[in-house]
Each structure stands twice: as structure tokens, then as C-alpha cells.
């Protein structure tokens, strides 16, 4: 095999992109692979992990058994990765790294979406709380146990940095939240992720791709559930303009196809806006290296000011009309109750956990036991958590 003829597409990257040839490496040293770049290997390890497969039965707004067509964490992550790759390609960044960060960003989420996380965070409040980004880091650095020489997936510095900081610095004047989860601080002591700096542009692409995909699939799922109607979207600036164009171009289009067309155009409009604004930001900031990106005093991959206002308006509309819809709130409350009850049950009776988990509980402090239960609970799918609840409490609660 002629290694010199293998195409890793290195030549198309900008000077400020991440470069797999000069990666900061992994916590545990590994020899370079002849067929895949370090970031490709990260992506492949993420895809082949147990945590990735579990995303198939984890949801965000709707419960996993309500419909086969609602988004799950898995389909959402794939959609985010597709948008992140598009942005990375347009900006001459490393597509594989952007994809890796996009695919791993939801690993730490609990069953039942944000309702489950809120419940677990409340239960864990006396023990340091629960944060899904910190949990994702625990999964890829400790809880996935597939390799002979290390725990976790031993991902590159760049992927871990992007996972932890894709929403911005965790320390310093630009940090959004002054409280840093202990798991992130403990890992940072082993491998400095530069928590006071902005993440690389690939991570920024993944972060804004998450927003774009989230907004689009909530519009789609909201219409599919009939909790929302196209008429309601006439109240929102961005979707109203898009619907007006669709009506002009396709006046006879049925409601279902009109909804699908709206979602596609919403994604396209936001992606094009991000590319244009990010190009302008790059021209103004003029980074000459990835270090310049890290030291920049701003996020570079952003919406335009106008689109940021539109996006905020759409989010506010979705919160008011979808996330706080009576039926969604009823399911949310049921989901929180399930997670709270499971945590209490496991904490009081660790032996009811599966053998491979309760075998780890001997001689643990209360803090360590709570964290072990959080690891177990947060890894559950919606289906598994519901079955556990029904089994342990001898009930048939099914969110109805």
C-alpha cells in the first residue's frame, strides 16, 4: 500500500482550522493509523460506542414510544453532524472533527430529555448536581470500557476540547456559567483543555449546527404532533417570510408538504446566514492560526445580528407553544417523577440495580454512590427507564 497516495484532504484546510497532522494527541499515546486521520478515528470510535447506540431510544421533547417518526437523540445528532460538516466545508475547516464533536455532544443526556436531566440534577443537588456536558466527558473518558489499555475512548484533545467548550469558555471573563462541574475540573487536571479559551471553529460549527437542527426538528415534530399548526407560524418573523415564499411558489401545495418545505428552507436559510456572517467575522478577526481562534475575544461562527433576533423569536415561540403545551407538560411531569423515584429507589436499595452495577456499590461513600447511580440512570434509554419503573413499582404508568 502506498501511504503517500492516501487522500486525507489536508490541502483544503484554512490556516486557522484544526490540523490532524499536528493534533495535540490523546491522553494515552497511540501510533498513527495509516488509513484514517486522528479525527476520523475519533468519529469511528464514537459511532461504535454503546453510548451512541443508546441515543436511538432517547428523546428531547416527545417520549420514545409516542411515534416512530419523532426525532430521537440519535437522529438529532446525525442531523447536527450533517449541518456541522456543511459549515466546516464552507469555511475550510476539518469536517471530520466537526462531525465528531456533533456526534458526541449529546452523549451525556438522560432519558426523557430535559425533564429527565432536571429531575436528576435535583436529586444530585446534595452531591454536586448533574450536568450533561460533564456526563458526556465521563462517558468518553471513563465509562465506555472497550479497550485493553485504557478506560473511555481516548479521543483526541481537539474532540474533547470541543465537547467541553462548544458553547464557549468555562473560565475567565467570557464564561457564561461560573460553576464548573467537578468532573470537568478533575479531567482538566490530567489534560489541560484550556477552559479559559474559546473552542476551535469546528466545535463552534457543531454548536450552532445544534441550534439550527434543534429549531428545525421541533418545528417538524410540533407540526407532526398537531400541537402546532402552520397558521401559528405566521406569527413568527422567519417562518412567516418562508411560508409566504412557499405559498407564492406552490399555491396548491398540501399542508403536509408545505410543512416539510418550511423545515428545509428554514435550515437552508440559517446555514447560509451562518456561513456569510462567519466569513465576515473571519475577515474582521483575521486569525492566522488555531491559537488565534482560541484567544479571540468572541465566538466567530455565529448568526448575523438579524438572524439572531429571528432565531430567538422562534425559540421563544416554541417554548411557549410546544414545550409548555399541556400534553407535553403532563408527559414531562410523568418523566420527572420516574427519574426521581428511580434515583430514590436505587439510593435506598442499591441491590435492586443490575448485578454489574450493584457489585460496585460496596464501601462507597454517599457521594460516590449517588454519582454511580447518576451514571446508571443517565445512561438509560426512555424504554429502559420506563420498564425499570414499572418493574420496581409494580405499575403500568405509560405517560397517558
Curated annotation (Swiss-Prot):
InterPro entries: dGTPase, dGTPase-like, dNTPase_2, HD/PDEase_dom, HD_domain, PHydrolase_assoc_dom
Keywords: Hydrolase
Domain of life: Bacteria
Gene3D superfamilies: Hypothetical protein af1432
GO biological process terms held by the UniProt record: dGTP catabolic process
SUPFAM superfamilies assigned to the protein according to its UniProt record, in alphabetical order: HD-domain/PDEase-like
Domain named HD: residues: 73-215
Entry keyword annotation includes Hydrolase: yes
GO molecular function term, any single one: dGTPase activity
Entry similarity comment: Belongs to the dGTPase family. Type 2 subfamily.
HAMAP family per UniProt: dGTPase_type2
Protein name: Deoxyguanosinetriphosphate triphosphohydrolase-like protein
